[in-house]
């Protein structure tokens, strides 16, 4: 909670302005300075600085809560606990949809519908609460320049034709989606760490980052000495900031991730196909074996609360798999992508056992083995 702005701690406006002139904006910035440095910046006595340090420390330190207290607080809170995906079977499995106050990751190969899902959720967050929405605005951070305003309008008109029956409603919804194109790691982190005031002033109810892996894999080569450590440090800071925003404002945060091929030692030595951006040790399996896994490695995978995998079944059908969730079992759904976005083909869901996962379809699109030159690992979903 060190990213909390000093303006929200209870300091006077005059003091906040004085601190901001020295680039001291957050609790972390303040607490990293010594008492002597703070005396110089604020012009206060040692006792005055000590009182400020105690105030800021109390404001950003996590407070002890009992389980009963948390339950009572959530019962008294009238804000929604979930954002519905309008995919009824998926919502049922997730006990309501995408959880507020947590990080939900969507991972899969290119073209399987990750951005389509994000655009669809952007529309849903702006809808009135009686339609399952959050009646708020959206921050959409686009690192791949994949967002399409035309597609947003098309999904809105096709999915909710009765509601979006006038141009005014379409304009209102599109004006609530605030798009930021950030193409470097520093830009993404700066944007995330500056969102607190925007969430308050603009009534932001959903934050989307599409995608996490795009900028990280371009800027960090894990094979270079020191890069892996710096990359993990960046990812930890990014995840911490996003979790703070999700928990502090009880909003859902949706992230997209890419996939990577994980090769055994023998095959990796013959062909340099292992993504350097993934801190994964080579498998000890059979010579020449490989599998497909979510990018960014184990460090990142433990940061997200829920992981949904999108994967191909054939040229038309795709599959959503709940691979990680504190509420739902391993579950899969078949869907297609149409004008109205993602559409489930089956209204019921089935739990997937560990044995059945070993026979689940590959994450990659169907290709002849001679084109791949690899033996795909069918237990992809278990490596998280």
From Swiss-Prot:
Write down the PROSITE patterns for this protein, in alphabetical order. RECA_2
Which SUPFAM superfamilies does this one have? P-loop containing nucleoside triphosphate hydrolases (SSF52540)
Single GO MF annotation = ATP binding
- Give GO terms for biological process: blastocyst growth; DNA recombination; DNA repair; double-strand break repair via homologous recombination; positive regulation of cell population proliferation; positive regulation of G2/M transition of mitotic cell cycle; reciprocal meiotic recombination; somite development
Cell location: Nucleus
Which Pfam families would you find in this protein's record? Rad51
Record InterPro entries? AAA+_ATPase, DNA_recomb/repair_Rad51_C, DNA_recomb/repair_RecA-like, P-loop_NTPase, RAD51B, RecA_ATP-bd
Known outcome of mutating residue 326 to L: Abolishes interaction with BCR-ABL SH3 domain
In which broad location class does this protein mainly occur, judging by the first location in its UniProt entry?
nucleus
Q: Which domain of life is it from?
A: Eukaryota
A single GO CC term for this protein reads: Rad51B-Rad51C-Rad51D-XRCC2 complex
Site residues, Breakpoint for translocation to form HMGA2-RAD51B: 252-253
Tissues/organs with expression = Expressed in a wide range of tissues.
Residues noted as binding ATP in the record, renumbered to the chain: 108-115
Tell me which UniProt keywords the record has, alphabetically: ATP-binding, Chromosomal rearrangement, DNA damage, DNA recombination, DNA repair, DNA-binding, Nucleotide-binding, Nucleus, Phosphoprotein
Q: Where is this region: Interaction with RAD51C?
A: 1-75
* Modification after translation, per record: Phosphorylated on tyrosine residues by BCR-ABL.
- Which PANTHER family does the record cross-reference, listed alphabetically? DNA REPAIR PROTEIN RAD51 HOMOLOG 2 (PTHR46456:SF1)
Task: State whether it acts alone or in a complex, and with which partners, per the record.
Answer: Part of the BCDX2 complex consisting of RAD51B, RAD51C, RAD51D and XRCC2; the complex has a ring-like structure arranged into a flat disc around a central channel. The BCDX2 subcomplex RAD51B:RAD51C interacts with RAD51. Interacts with SWSAP1; involved in homologous recombination repair. Interacts with HELQ.
| UniProt function note | Involved in the homologous recombination repair (HRR) pathway of double-stranded DNA breaks arising during DNA replication or induced by DNA-damaging agents. May promote the assembly of presynaptic RAD51 nucleoprotein filaments. Binds single-stranded DNA and double-stranded DNA and has DNA-dependent ATPase activity. Part of the RAD51 paralog protein complex BCDX2 which acts in the BRCA1-BRCA2-dependent HR pathway. Upon DNA damage, BCDX2 acts downstream of BRCA2 recruitment and upstream of RAD51 recruitment.
Task: Describe the family membership recorded for this protein in Swiss-Prot or TrEMBL.
Answer: Belongs to the RecA family. RAD51 subfamily.
Which disease is the protein involved in? A chromosomal aberration involving RAD51B is found in pulmonary chondroid hamartoma. Translocation t(6;14)(p21;q23-24) with HMGA1.
Q: Under what name is this protein listed?
A: DNA repair protein RAD51 homolog 2
């Amino acid at each position: 909670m060190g990213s909390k702005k000093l303006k929200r701690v209870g300091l006077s406006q005059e003091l906040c302005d004085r601190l901001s002139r020295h680039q001291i904006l957050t609790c972390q910035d303040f607490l990293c300075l010594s008492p002597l440095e703070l005396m110089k910046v604020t012009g206060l006595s040692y006792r005055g600085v000590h009182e400020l340090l105690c105030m800021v420390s109390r404001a950003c330190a996590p407070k002890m809560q009992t389980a009963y207290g948390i339950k009572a607080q959530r019962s008294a809170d009238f804000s929604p606990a979930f954002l519905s995906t309008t995919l009824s079977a998926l919502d049922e499995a997730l006990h309501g949809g995408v959880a507020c106050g947590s990080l939900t990751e969507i991972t899969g190969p290119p073209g399987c519908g990750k951005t389509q899902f994000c655009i669809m959720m952007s529309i849903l967050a702006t809808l009135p609460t009686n339609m399952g929405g959050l009646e708020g605005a959206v921050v959409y951070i686009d690192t791949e320049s994949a967002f399409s305003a035309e597609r947003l309008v098309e999904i809105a008109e096709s999915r909710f034709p009765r509601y979006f029956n006038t141009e005014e409603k379409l304009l209102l919804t599109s004006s609530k989606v605030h798009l930021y194109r950030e193409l470097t790691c520093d830009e993404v982190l700066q944007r995330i760490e500056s969102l607190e005031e925007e969430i308050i002033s603009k009534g932001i109810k959903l934050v989307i980052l599409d995608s996490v892996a795009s900028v990280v894999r371009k800027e960090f080569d894990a094979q270079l000495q020191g890069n892996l450590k710096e990359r993990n440090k960046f990812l930890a800071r990014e995840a911490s900031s996003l979790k703070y925003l999700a928990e502090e404002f009880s909003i859902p945060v949706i992230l997209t991730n890419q996939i990577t091929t994980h090769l055994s030692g023998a095959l990796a030595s013959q062909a340099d196909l292992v993504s350097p951006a993934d801190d994964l040790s080579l498998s000890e399996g059979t010579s020449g074996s490989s599998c497909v896994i979510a990018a960014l490695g184990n460090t990142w995978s433990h940061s997200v609360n829920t992981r949904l995998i999108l994967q191909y079944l054939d040229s038309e059908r795709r599959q959503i798999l709940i691979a990680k969730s504190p509420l739902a079992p391993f579950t899969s759904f078949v869907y297609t992508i149409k004008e109205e976005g993602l559409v489930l083909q089956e209204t019921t869901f089935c739990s997937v056992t560990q044995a059945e996962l070993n026979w689940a379809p590959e994450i990659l699109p169907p290709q002849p083995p001679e084109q791949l030159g690899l033996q795909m690992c069918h237990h992809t979903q278990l490596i998280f």
